[in-house]
Swiss-Prot record:
Keywords: Autocatalytic cleavage, Decarboxylase, Lyase, Polyamine biosynthesis, Pyruvate, S-adenosyl-L-methionine, Schiff base, Spermidine biosynthesis, Zymogen. Heterooctamer of four alpha and four beta chains arranged as a tetramer of alpha/beta heterodimers. One of its GO terms (molecular function) is adenosylmethionine decarboxylase activity. This is S-adenosylmethionine decarboxylase proenzyme. The gene is speD. Belongs to the prokaryotic AdoMetDC family. Type 2 subfamily. It is an enzyme of class 4 (lyase). Signal peptide: none annotated. GO terms for cellular component: cytosol. It comes from Methylococcus capsulatus (strain ATCC 33009 / NCIMB 11132 / Bath). InterPro entries: AdoMetDC_fam_prok, S-AdoMet_deCO2ase_bac, S-AdoMet_deCO2ase_core.
């Protein structure tokens, strides 16, 4: 698509990214589960989430107009930012179908759209499994696509599973009056993810091109049991327990990834 498209007035296209991440954990006791929930709730407090969203604003070249944030009892947090497109997008960020920056490359600079994040820690009542979900929605009106924030978001959370939906709505007119229903090329959300990140995940696409709807699921390829154990390691588990816990964790991840429940085989 022509990057030099001359528009009549403001770019009225709305580009929306829905980004859901999951972190999975196993704790041997109910007390351990409670401590995990307390740990993850503190790690992703409203204050921390505000900083993450501030960096997202810098990536997409937005100006923050208002921030509302709240920590909830017994757990969970929410942050909502009202934003507008900045006078200038960051020089290194374009609307091309390519990955955006990593967290270490972002310097926050605060120069009618919005960004929201909500967190949902929870635990299985009997199996020792706990999950943490963060839902992030980035909706922009203007030139820059929120997809440029993907790399940063994936690396800002402990992402075992990532589910993403991107859509473009509305239209904008060029100077001749012709309507344009999208202003950038896109074949897959995967093209906005760096090779280093893509190598770590199995990914599935479901896209409806004519409706400007793009859907990508990601799940980590390599399973290291120690990465999913809280306050213990696999050497502290007897072989039978180790195998059972690994099966539980992998089943939980598969159910979340595919959105369906499976019977646990004995």
């Amino acid at each position: 698509m022509d990057n030099k498209l001359q528009l009549h007035g403001f770019n009225n296209l709305t580009k929306s990214l829905s980004f859901n991440i999951y972190d999975i954990c196993y704790a041997k006791s109910e007390a351990g589960q409670r401590r995990y929930i307390e740990y993850i709730d503190e790690a992703y407090s409203a204050k921390r989430l505000t900083q993450i969203l501030t960096d997202v604003n810098a990536i997409i070249g937005a100006e923050i107009l208002n921030i509302a944030r709240q920590d909830y009892e017994p757990q969970g947090a929410s942050v909502t930012m009202l934003i507008s497109e900045g006078h200038e997008a960051p020089a290194a960020i374009t609307n091309s179908e390519s990955p955006g920056p990593m967290p270490e490359a972002v310097v926050a600079h605060l120069n009618k759209s919005h960004i929201t994040v909500h967190t949902y820690p929870e635990s299985h009542p009997h199996a020792g499994i706990s999950t943490f979900r963060a839902d992030i929605d980035v909706s922009t009106c203007g030139r820059i696509s929120p997809l440029k924030a993907l790399n940063y978001l994936i690396h800002s959370f402990e992402s075992d599973i990532v589910i993403m939906d991107y859509r473009v709505r509305g239209f904008t007119r060029d100077i001749s009056g012709q309507k344009h229903y999208i202003d950038h090329d896109i074949t897959s959300i995967q093209n906005y993810i760096s090779d280093a990140t893509a190598d770590r995940y199995q990914m599935i696409d479901v896209n409806v091109y004519q409706e400007k709807i793009f859907h990508t699921k990601m799940i980590l390829k390599d399973f290291n049991l120690d990465n999913y154990l809280f306050e213990t390691d696999k050497d502290q588990l007897v072989p039978e327990e180790r195998a059972h816990v690994q099966k539980q964790l992998q089943r939980e991840m598969a159910e979340i990834f595919y959105g369906r429940n499976y019977k646990l085989r004995r």
